[in-house]
Amino acid sequence: PIFSFNSSQIIAFPLSGFTTDWFKALLYQETLHEALTNSLIVAASSSIFATILGTLAARSSSRYNFRGKQFSLTFIMAPLVLPEIIVGVSLLIVLIQLGLPLNLWSVVLGHTLLIMPFSILIMNSAFNNLDISLEEASLDLGETQLGTFRRVILPLVYPGIMASLLLGFTLSLDEFIIAFFLTGTETTLPVYIWSLFRFPKQLPTTMALGTILILVSSVSYTHLRAHETVSH
């Protein structure tokens, strides 16, 4: 962050002087704005899809026993232990073989597969901590399975759903490897930042962008911690 305020384009000590020109330059970089918008779209879409699928998978695994259950869970959780580069290359090969274009939605697909195991772990814990007698009482009172799930179970696991969404959004926003392999002409923010490092003259601007991201992350974390403290 210190070098983002340095008036020189050379990243070295001693500093030449103080300036905020690098931050002002960010306002006029349309490619940066497009990359940020793309990342927000991908992160929001991926976290929502992963949370929906993860909630359904966690509900099925915690509530029902069926043939192939363990194998299915192991297959879904594979991205947790596989290197991201293997996941990215594998998805790239599959998409090319199917003749599908590489765009933001291919990145959404990759990020959804990457985030989904985390969502399942979070929602599994939420469902396992539920009092099953509440569900049974709802059914005994004449509510349907779907109505019970919507009116009783979902409100109880709401904290888990929000945790899954926030974690998924953060992981997707920060992810580089899968986005690098699956993106087309529309780049995400991490890929855009990586491309700037090839041009030394762009380093101060990159440092300024990094400073803003650190500031936003710190403020968000402090706000969440304060909210948790008030809640408790």
Task: Please annotate each region the language model reported.
Residues 112-113, 120-124, 131-132, 145-174:
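Transmembrane alpha-helices
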